[in-house]
């Protein structure tokens, strides 16, 4: 039994604790994720946005065995659809990319729910480094100016100086600059090309 106080009188309100069987809990989770909803005969672009809204976000995972993970997640809910619709949603601003545990596509209307993270990026752990930002102010300023003058950039637009990197996390400085600016909400992803 749970007890709460009535806001008007401070009198106790007793509530019973809801009980879900394991089967009901599983069913509830599958339904919330849209996996129990019958598919349309043919998916439409609006269905893709509705699906992301229903899930609240779509994790961006670059692992690809059959296809990139986000495409498989959408296929499991929509069936056959045009993968370019996801890029169109991003380009049109219906979804945005940001950290929600990991990198995710998130409906535009939920931007306000994550803005506090952008305003306090130091709480984001490895995804942000105030020390990096301070140490590389000049180079970061040059990247921002380049974007202002010439438009969006990708980390791939910058050549690695010196030896080739040796692993997933051996990022060239420009990639790290862009990631820090992204985490601080100073840059947003406008589009992806080949999932970059």
Regions found by a protein language model. Name each.
Residues 4-7, 12-196:
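Long, low-complexity intrinsically disordered regions
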